[in-house]
Every structure is written in structure tokens, then in C-alpha cells.
Amino acid sequence: GKMGEEIGPEFVVAAGDIHHFEGVRSVNDPLWMTNYELIYSHPELMIDWYPILGNHEYRGNTQAVLDYTNVSRRWSMPARYYTKSFNEEGVTVRIVWIDTAPLIDKYRNDTQTYPDACKQDMKKQLAWIDDVLTKAKEDWVIVVGHHPIYAETSKDDSERSDLQNRLDPILRKHKVDMYVCGHIHNFQHIRMNGSNIDYVVNS
């Protein structure tokens, strides 16, 4: 809230895991109040929120996270992955929100803990990302996912290697400006040799 007062955000990009632990069971789950409504209650945060699913949401009812769009005025999640274009004083920005858990074998293969991950069509999403980025003509193109492609972390290397093999070639092909993610609970800004993409962890 205090930061909101200082910078006056236009909207919030929520890179997953609003609900930690086991996600939520429904749109009426009390965790919506304890994890979201009561925490982010400052007047400056009563603006549009554009979220994506994190791995913890995948432990619960992922459809309920999308359906909360019909409950909360500020929660705006039209699909598991989606895109919007913004124009501010002649500068255009395209943000592409993606669903990274289904792109990682660790989650796809653990059908007991993450039952919805294996049900998602990975090839369809990757083709959609490629198509959106092919058509993007904005001044800035930013992709938002929950999991990092590159990061210094003790978390499972396979998470990043799967994204390096499946997602990163598409981002590099289209020369996106930035990939923003969460998941590892710290801040990192990474540049890789041979790529002009800024890989930012902000969680």
C-alpha cells in the first residue's frame, strides 16, 4: 500500500502463487479473504489485477482462480494465458501472460499433487505464444510467467531446463524485451550471452 501511494500504479501484474500451499477450493474459499482481499486492501491497490497461475494454485482448483474474475471487480483473468496491449502517451506495451506449470514435466508428471497440469495442451499454448509474438508490433513486449527460465536458486534445475528448451527459443526468436516471473521469493535481474532479453525475478 505504501509503495502504491508513492508510485501510483495503473495496474498490478501478479505472477502467480497469490495462494500459497494448497491453492483454493472454490471462489468462496475463505483464503480469498486472508490471502488477497484483506492483504491488498489499500485504496491504491483497488485497481485492475492481471494474474496468472502459479504452482501452488495448481495444487487446488485452478478453474476457481479464473472464475474469481466474476466475483472481484479488480481480479481480471480471462484465461490461463492471455495478452493485452497498453498505450500510454504514445508508447505501446504488449504484455503476454502465460501458464508455465504445464510447460514443466515435474508438474505434468505429478498427477496427484498437480492434477490439472497434465490436462493442459502444452503444444497449443506454445503455438499461441509464438503466434502472439509474431503479430506483436508494440514498442515493448513483455512476457510474464510464474517460473523462471534462468535464476540462481536451489529449486529443481529441471524446471528451468524445461523452459529453456521449450519457451526460451520462442522468446529469443521474437526478441522480446523482458521475461518477468516469480516463484523463487527474491529479486534477480539476469542477462544471458547471446540474448538481449532481460530476465527478471520479482517475487
Predicted features, each with a name:
Residues M3-A14:
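Catalytic domains of carbohydrate-active enzymes, especially glycoside hydrolases
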Residues E5, H20-V141, S154-M178, I184-S203:
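Extended active-site neighborhood of metal-dependent phosphoesterases/phosphodiesterases
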